[in-house]
Amino acid sequence: MDHEIFEAGRVTLQCGITLPDCKVAFKTHGKLAPSKDNVVVFPSRYAGTHADQTYLIGPGMALDPEKYFIVCINMLGSGLSSSPSNTARPLSGPDFPLVTQYDNVCLQERLLREVFGVETVRLVCGWSMGGQQAFQWASLFPDSVEAMSCFCGQGTTAPHTHVFLEGVKQGIILDPAWENGYYKEQPWRGLTAKGRTWAGWALSREWYRAKMWETQGFASLEDYLKGNWDGIYFGRDSNDMLSLIATWQACDLGNNPVYNGDREAAYAAIKAKSIILPGRTDFYFPVEDNEAEVALMPNAELRVIESIWGHYAGGGRVAEDTAFIDQALKDLLA
């Protein structure tokens, strides 16, 4: 096993349901300083794990393990932390409860404090749903987080993104093999439909117009869809992915016991020096939404990733985009 497990025990989630044996999977890079002031928190993305986050970690990069203690934490629902696929009945499969980003970040704060004795975070950063968690960290623990960056993500899910995710969800649950979530095998047709739907959202019009699939080794658009997207989620559990979609849809920075629905107060509470990095062509998290968020934050800057790679501008696919993000993180850590 290439990761560790934080045994959180009985955890009552924001929805009111208790997980009797909650587990949080995490991976660390580097060493914790004796002063415990070199901690970077890097939460996971949708349908991803800590193993997908090495693109921003390495010698000479902002997240240099020789300087920082980098903690990559897997969300509940990721398949490694407590998830529908690994939780015992009666909370397994489709009966797994709704998890919010408030739940995830409260568990992550416990992990740092109880396992490592850490109370101050030098930087929290993340891509996509990882960025949602970065916002939650900075808002819920404003006196503990010194710097924050969200790339191709938001603190609150927009209605348009919510609707897109509904379409993705329907692609899975309308497969006859779904069987209301009590499937005997994965609903492969539904997962294929999910991949095809994602293909039109993850990358931009400009990307497709430029036939960028040819740079990925595909002779035609159909070859690309079949070769890259049709089976992209076959290695993931469907209930896990639906749990993460529910978490994504429920993401609202103000909807928690700290701010009681006052979203503007939740953004205004962020003290951390912040750089928000939307992708110019990201359909999930448009620049305009991040502009509205930054306007509510007292110490935030907006830097747009000028890329045709859509949502993937934040995910390490293109060296230039990754270098742009890395420079922002270096500026925050300077």
Predicted feature locations:
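Gly/Pro-rich cap/lid or specificity-loop segments adjacent to the active site
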Residues: L19, A47-Q132, S139, D143-L165, ...
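A short loop-to-beta-strand scaffold at the N-terminal edge of the catalytic core in hydrolase folds
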Residues: L19-K31
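Alpha/beta-hydrolase-fold enzymes
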Residues: S144, C150-G231
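Acidic catalytic loop of the alpha/beta-hydrolase fold
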Residues: W248-D252, R280-F285
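Short beta-strand/loop motif that positions the catalytic acidic residue
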Residues: I270, I276-P278
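Catalytic active-site module of serine/aspartate enzymes centered on a nucleophile-bearing elbow/loop
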Residues: E291-A292, N299-A334
